[in-house]
Structures are given as C-alpha cells and as structure tokens.
Amino acid sequence: MSNNTNKQYTTQELNSMSNDDLARLGTELDDVTIAYRKERFPVANDPAEKRAARSVGIWAALGILGGIGFLITYIFWPWEYQGHGDDGLMWYTLYTPMLGITSGLCIISLGIAGVLYVKKFIPEEIAVQRRHDGPSEEVDRRTLVALLNDSWQTSTLGRRKVLQGLLAGGAVMAGLTIVAPLGGMIKNPWRPQDGPMDVMGDGTLWTSGWTLQEQGVKLYLGRDTGAIAESHTGESGQHWITTGVSRLVRMRPEDLAAASMETVFPLPAEDVNDGDLYDPQRDVYTNHMHSIHGPRNAVMLIRLRTADAERVIEREGQESFHYGDYYAYSKICTHIGCPTSLYEAQTNRILCPCHQSQFDALHYGKPVFGPAARALPQLPITVDEEGYLIADGNFIEPLGPAFWERKS
C-alpha cells in the first residue's frame, strides 16, 4: 500500500503526473490496489477481437432497428379502435403487442450489447480493497447519534402523538395507493356475467335490459307505479309480502298526455302482471325491481304536441324509431351518466340537472348546451296488436357516457 495516500498534493505535483499515475493515486486514496490486469486482446488485429466487435455491433444494430420500429408503429400503425366484425380489427388488435415487441427488442438488444462489450473488451482485473476492521471511531459514533437525536428533538414530533399516527397512516395509504392500481389486472371488465343475459344486461357496457329484444324477448315499455311490498308483522317478526304486487305496468299511447314525459323500463312479457293478465298469486316484484335498478335501463317516453312533432328532425338511419308523436330517448346523460330527469315542454328540451346539459327533443336528442357532446340514444318503439307500447328493437349504440372502446 502506498505511503502517500494521506499526502497533500500541490497543483504542480498533480500536473506532473500522467493519467495512469492519477488513476493509480485515485484507487490508493480509496484504499484499493489493482493487483492484476490483463487486456482482452493484447495482440493487434486479433481475429477474435473482430468477431467480438461484430457480435456487439449486431446487437446494437438490432436495438437501433427496434427503436426505429417502435417509432414507426407509434406514429403510423392504425391505432383507431375497431369493434368486432369491423375491417381492420386484426391490425388494431396488434397495435399494443407491436409497441411492446419493438420497445422490448430495443431495450433488450442494447442491454445485451452493453453486457457483451464489458465482457469482451473491458480488461480483466483483480482489485483488492483494504478492510477496515472494528467499529467506526468513537467520536464519529457519538457525534452521529447526537445529530440524529438533535434532529428528532428539534422536530418536536416525539411529543405529537396525533401527528405521528397521521403521518404513519399517510405513509401506509401512500403505499396502498401505489399498489391498488394493480387490482385492475385481477378482473376483466369485459367478461360477461355468469349465466344468460337478464333484464339488467350481461354486465358489460354494451348491453342493457333492452338488449333482450335482440334475443326475441317481447319488451313492453313499463311504467313505474311506485307500488311497494306489503309489510306484515307476525310471530317470526316483520316480513314483506310481494305476491300480487306489480311495480311495472304496461302503457298504451293514450296513457300519456301531449307535451309530457314518462320514465319507462323494459318489461318482459313473461313478467307482465297487470290488466287482463293480472294474477294476485304471481310474484314478479323482484324482477320488476331488477329492471328498475338496471344501470342503463331508464328511458324517457316523450309525447310531443302534434305541431311540434311536425318540426322534428330525424337522425339518419333512425327515421322509423318513433311511433307517431311518441319518442323514446335514453335517460342516461352522455356526459357522465347522470339521469336527464327534466323535460321542458315549452321548449322541448331535455335537461340534466347535474351539470346542466340540455338536449333538443325535436332534433334527435342532440346536445345544445352544457358539457355533453353526444346525442341521447333513441329506442325504436311501436305498439303491439293489443295497443300496448313495446320496443321495436334495441338501441343501436352504447348507452351512457363515453368509454375507451366505443367509437364515438
């Protein structure tokens, strides 16, 4: 070991040293000695050196190609969403995998090139560092402990138990906040529910109770009567009887006055229990409540004045969705899903009270004010042979606010 590690060198002495001398001095100042060093290719123009350089160059070139491929994919690949059955679905499906493949090729190839360069070109050496036995000097230990104690005492945190608990809880919650997003990988949000589709849809954003119409189920426009189960108190305590209670009933056109609105829900034919089909022994209350609680089931049935109906502007492809003066629009606002529960008969505007979006009922539910950007979806309706209003099809677009997979 050099005896000059503690020497104070002047500028002139340092200037007189070569680069090798300065490098050796630097290691000695850290108590490190280079005991052995061997060049990988001591002979000039060694064929093995050329092969090593070629292998490193190949991996580096692959990394560059991967980076270029990533940029080309990111900029020019058809990334716009395509639904099932649409042209270009395969290209859209490959967009994210191609980003991963090209970026992975770039990073891994450059990493391999770096490792190979170190293994094949950096000289092989053995370095020895002096081991410092025993603890640090007493003065270093005492002063370090004193500084830590002083920091703790001057912070006054030791006597603030409430703040200690809050800070500790905040640290725990911060950790959970970092880990919690991983929960999105546990459940597939597009996996349909177990079992067949019911009056609440299949659990995905594409469906609602009205989707049952596509499966051949006859759906009436059900009016909510507000009927509730009857309460009875017996020896076993209070219980509720739902037999014979019909929460939803069918509607005829004459049940709705001009310039008025009614909220309706999908009522499957098998769950009808009103009028000439009423049976006091049937229990359909639970099914009716499921329809009412369906997250995208609520529909506004609007009857326009005859004069107003003559001024309606139909949406292209939806000219036959109405029945006379009757128009049915989804009650789920296209902004963030609030209920558009207000209808202004004088102006024929549908209002969302949450964020003040307004939709023109005479212009296919087009937004005319507020943050909503899309028209309210329209439900095709007609009447059956008995004169009851029924759904004449399903909505032709997803209901509610926008989400990543929808096109508009």
From Swiss-Prot:
Organism per entry: Corynebacterium efficiens (strain DSM 44549 / YS-314 / AJ 12310 / JCM 11189 / NBRC 100395)
Cofactor comment: Binds 1 [2Fe-2S] cluster per subunit.
Residues bound to [2Fe-2S] cluster: 333, 335, 352, 355
A GO cellular component annotation in the UniProt record: plasma membrane
Pfam families: QcrA_N, Rieske
Protein name (database record): Cytochrome bc1 complex Rieske iron-sulfur subunit
Topology of this chain in the membrane: Multi-pass membrane protein
Localization per Swiss-Prot or TrEMBL: Cell membrane
Location (main, coarse): membrane
Residue ranges occupied by any Rieske domain in the UniProt entry: 293-390
InterPro entries attached to this UniProt entry: QcrA_N, Rieske_2Fe-2S, Rieske_2Fe-2S_sf, Rieske_Fe-S_prot
Keywords: 2Fe-2S, Cell membrane, Disulfide bond, Electron transport, Iron, Iron-sulfur, Membrane, Metal-binding, Oxidoreductase, Respiratory chain, Transmembrane, Transmembrane helix, Transport
